[in-house]
């Protein structure tokens, strides 16, 4: 079944775990505006950004999208 709404809660858990939005923004060369838009539901990360984020946090894209609660990549 296709999920209608993307839940990025795990993305923001990971950002808090790293310390700050500004640090993640600098490290990944993603604008603070983009991260703010993701947080406020105005947009979602594109596929390239999702892969970058998953690699950065050491987790799966499915975890970031809220499709699984298992953080570890398989």
Can you name each region flagged by the protein language model?
Residues 1-19, 23:
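A short, Lys/Arg-rich alpha-helix, primarily the initiator
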Residues 1-3, 65-74:
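Short, charged recognition helix plus adjacent turn
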Residues 18-37:
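Short alpha-helical DNA-recognition segment
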Residues 31-33, 46, 60:
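Short coil turns linking two alpha-helices in DNA-binding domains
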Residues 39, 57, 65-68:
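DNA major-groove recognition helix of helix-turn-helix
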Residues 42-52, 73:
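Short, basic-rich loop-to-helix N-cap that marks the start of a DNA-contacting helix
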Residues 48-63:
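DNA major-groove recognition helix of helix-turn-helix/homeodomain DNA-binding modules
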């Amino acid at each position: 079944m296709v999920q209608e709404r993307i839940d990025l809660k795990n993305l923001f858990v990971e950002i808090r775990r790293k310390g700050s939005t500004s640090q993640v923004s600098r490290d990944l060369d993603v604008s603070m505006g983009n991260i703010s838009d993701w947080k406020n539901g105005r947009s979602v990360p594109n596929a390239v950004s999702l892969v970058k984020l998953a690699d950065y946090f050491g987790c799966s894209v499915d975890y970031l999208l809220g499709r699984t609660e298992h953080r570890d990549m398989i």
